Structure formats: C-alpha cells, structure tokens
Amino acid sequence: MNAQETLDTLKSLGTEQNRKIYRRHGAGEDVYGVSFAHLKDLKKKIKIDHDLAVALWESGNHDARMLAGMIADPKRLDARTLDTWVKGLRNYVETDALGGLAAKSPHARETMARWIASDEEWTASAGWRVLAQVAMDDDALPDEYFERFLSTIERDIDESQNRVRHEMNNALIAIGIRNPALQEKAVAAAARIGKVEVDHGETGCKTPDAAGYIRKTVERKK
C-alpha cells in the first residue's frame, strides 16, 4: 500500500467512540480513531516499510503516526529527521511512539541528551522516554551511565513540566529494574522524591509510585 491507500484504510477503520477517547488523550482533531488491534493487524500486513512510515508520520494524522511507529526501520532514522519529528509532537502517545523509535536508532544517546535538555515539554518528555527504553534494552551500559541520571531526576523532577515529570518517573523505574545495585539506588531516590504529581487530564491514567513499581517488577522476574 502507498501512503494514500494506507490513510484511506485507517480512515475506514476508525470509530467515533475511539475518536472521542483519543481526543481526551490529546490526539487533536486529525484522528480517525483506529483501535490498537486494527493497527497491529495492519502492522502484520505491511511489516517494515520505512518510506511508508515516513510519509505516514509526516501526514500529521494521529493514527497514521501510531502505525508509522510500528512499521518504521529505526536504523534508517537520521538525527535530523528525529529532531524534525519531535518538534511536531502533540500528545504523550505520539511522544512514547517516537521515543521508542529514537531509542533503537543509531543516534539514540546523543538524541536523548539533546531532547532532555530542551525547554519544550514534549521534546524533553521524549528524551526521558528514550532513556527509559535504553535502560531496558542496552545491557552493555555500565551502572555509572545511569547513576548520573538518577541524580538529575532527583534534583529536577519537582520543578519539571507536567509530562516531563511522568517520563522522568518512568525512567527512574526503568533504571531501577536493571539490576540489584541500581534498584537500591533508584528506590532510595524515589523515597527522597516522594509522590510525583502529574495532571493526566480527563483520562484514567496515573503516574505510578516508582519504589513500589520497581519492587513489584523485580519480584515478578524472580
């Protein structure tokens, strides 16, 4: 399928109920309301098609961007494209999708550093999302790499923007479940931070207690 055919397919699969739900989560007006199950079916059909993914993301449609995140080839994402895309983020769902892609790109760590330093809420959120993914995926990085981010999170989370606080908390959790040494340090940092307040708007989403979440996740892994 080309980009227009894919957009037409997405439009045909959308529902008004999903559009209402997605808009509560920040999707805006350009949304078809395609279920995650239908997106997964399309992903299976298309597999990896990076050129199509680029066209879909740049269409600006929310559902198209979700599918783009599933069919893109992260190895073909250059830093310029990532920096262009991050400027167009409008909600946390797109932020999570782009952060997950960026974490698997050849430019993950340098992109993460630029984004974390940004004053833009969605850009900084995406940077912390990259860090969380790197913490979960890259077993080769030493503990020292992540310890400095624990210090940054503890120092800055209270004064950070709303969605940035949520992603920093998620990064804290991801670091804490890497190994016992980082678990101890992350749980201690979470205790000093205390409850992380995040406004999730008209949704049922919540920001988890980092220390409790880390402990439960580690226990399940045993």
Feature names for model-found ranges:
Residues 1-222:
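Alpha-helical scaffold domains
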